[in-house]
């Protein structure tokens, strides 16, 4: 398992699907290429075609991370007192809200507004904070999508390894990486 995850981490760095995810900022648009890259690297079609679409639909860990950080940043900027319980509540709300995001560019921005709405900010502060987040949205969206696609491939490799549905000859073949990238 450790060997599969270590090799998967290396292959995600120079993966065409990761580059397309970064450029398009869309998990859904990257999905066919992600499946193809995983299959060329030795993950069985059965695992890749089940796990990756499920991950592209539900696994938005990059969005959950950004939503948590953005809400905490804006509440601190407007001097809203945060106790540990509220920070945990923000993180849990972000995890739940991120699973409702669409896998399209800008899909996570709306959920940030929903979480901010419950933090006791005035309407003017909400608009100003949302405007600030909107200015950096494209850059953060590209990074979030790259993280989402990378974590989907790691989960697929882990499940394939547990189910003995991974071809280590393809996984350890450096020429397969050059053909894809």
Question: How does the language model describe each region?
Answer:
Residues 17, 21-98, 156, 173:
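Helix-loop-helix junctions within the multi-pass membrane cores of secondary transporters/permeases
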Residues 1-13:
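Single conserved hydrophobic/aromatic residue that forms the stacking wall/gate
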Residues 68-181:
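Transmembrane alpha-helical segments and their short flanking loops
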Residues 3, 32, 45, 122-129:
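Short, structured coil/loop segments at alpha-helix boundaries
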Residues 16-24, 113-120:
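Small-residue-rich segments of transmembrane alpha-helices in multi-pass membrane proteins
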Residues 4, 17, 60, 138-139, ...:
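Hydrophobic alpha-helical segments, especially transmembrane helices
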């Amino acid at each position: 398992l450790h060997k599969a995850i270590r090799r998967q981490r290396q292959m995600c760095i120079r993966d065409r699907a990761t580059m397309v995810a970064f450029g398009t900022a869309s998990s859904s648009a990257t999905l066919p290429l992600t499946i193809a890259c995983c299959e060329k690297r030795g993950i069985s079609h059965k695992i890749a075609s089940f796990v990756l679409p499920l991950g592209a639909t539900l696994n938005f860990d990059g969005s959950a991370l950004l939503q948590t950080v953005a809400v905490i940043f804006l509440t601190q900027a407007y001097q809203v007192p945060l106790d540990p319980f509220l920070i945990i509540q923000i993180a849990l709300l972000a995890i739940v809200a991120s699973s409702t995001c669409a896998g399209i560019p800008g899909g996570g921005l709306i959920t940030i507004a929903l979480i901010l709405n419950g933090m006791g900010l005035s309407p003017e502060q909400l608009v100003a904070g949302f405007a600030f987040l909107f200015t950096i949205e494209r850059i953060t969206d590209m990074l979030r999508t790259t993280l989402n696609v990378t974590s989907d491939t790691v989960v697929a490799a882990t499940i394939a390894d547990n189910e003995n549905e991974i071809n280590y000859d393809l996984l350890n073949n450096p020429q397969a990486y050059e053909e894809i990238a």
